[in-house]
Amino acid sequence: MAKLSDIYQEQVIDKLINQFSYKSRMQVPNIEKIILNMGVGQTVTDKKLLDNAVANLTAISGQKPIITKARKSIASFKIRHGYPIGCKVTLRGKRMWEFFDKLISIVIPRIRDFRGFSIKSFDGRGNYSIGVVEQIIFPEIDYDKIDRVRGMNITITTTANSNNEGYALLSALNFPFRKNK
């Protein structure tokens, strides 16, 4: 098991039970899944870009992504319904905990001029979304072999019922939030 899942089981559950006075351990919020989404809008002109994005996301996540398709046609963007426009991966279980551990301990410290994530990125139900500007912050990506720098969205889905519970869960797992001044 990943070391963060052990920390969650041994320390975080008890801390959150005391903080929110839950009656059962099953009420304590948990990370349900992590979704990595990479949109590749330039696939209209070059089909190879999507293959490179899939390869990057496979290296980052450790599993093969699915290709996302356009839900409707938009003439100004030159896309049609069903046209491939990106890729995404949903991580659960052991891979999710390993990715979350890698994200906190290796990837986030490699972001230039990083001062912490804003707490305003919660969605109202305890889920948190991050936008990563460049994929080269991940150690699996070789800078010399990428065709172009592209970003991705990372969504951490929790079983929390509110933003306060989600914030408490991620803070207890040492997620780097910005300190309000």
Curated annotation (Swiss-Prot):
PROSITE patterns: RIBOSOMAL_L5. One of its GO terms (biological process) is translation. Keywords: Ribonucleoprotein, Ribosomal protein, RNA-binding, rRNA-binding, tRNA-binding. GO terms for molecular function: rRNA binding; structural constituent of ribosome; tRNA binding. One of its GO terms (cellular component) is ribonucleoprotein complex. InterPro entries: Ribosomal_uL5 (IPR002132), Ribosomal_uL5_bac-type (IPR020930), Ribosomal_uL5_C (IPR031309), Ribosomal_uL5_CS (IPR020929), Ribosomal_uL5_dom_sf (IPR022803), Ribosomal_uL5_N (IPR031310). Pfam families: Ribosomal_L5 (PF00281), Ribosomal_L5_C (PF00673). This is one of the proteins that bind and probably mediate the attachment of the 5S RNA into the large ribosomal subunit, where it forms part of the central protuberance. In the 70S ribosome it contacts protein S13 of the 30S subunit (bridge B1b), connecting the 2 subunits; this bridge is implicated in subunit movement. Contacts the P site tRNA; the 5S rRNA and some of its associated proteins might help stabilize positioning of ribosome-bound tRNAs. Belongs to the universal ribosomal protein uL5 family. Part of the 50S ribosomal subunit; part of the 5S rRNA/L5/L18/L25 subcomplex. Contacts the 5S rRNA and the P site tRNA. Forms a bridge to the 30S subunit in the 70S ribosome. This is Large ribosomal subunit protein uL5. It comes from Baumannia cicadellinicola subsp. Homalodisca coagulata. The gene is rplE.
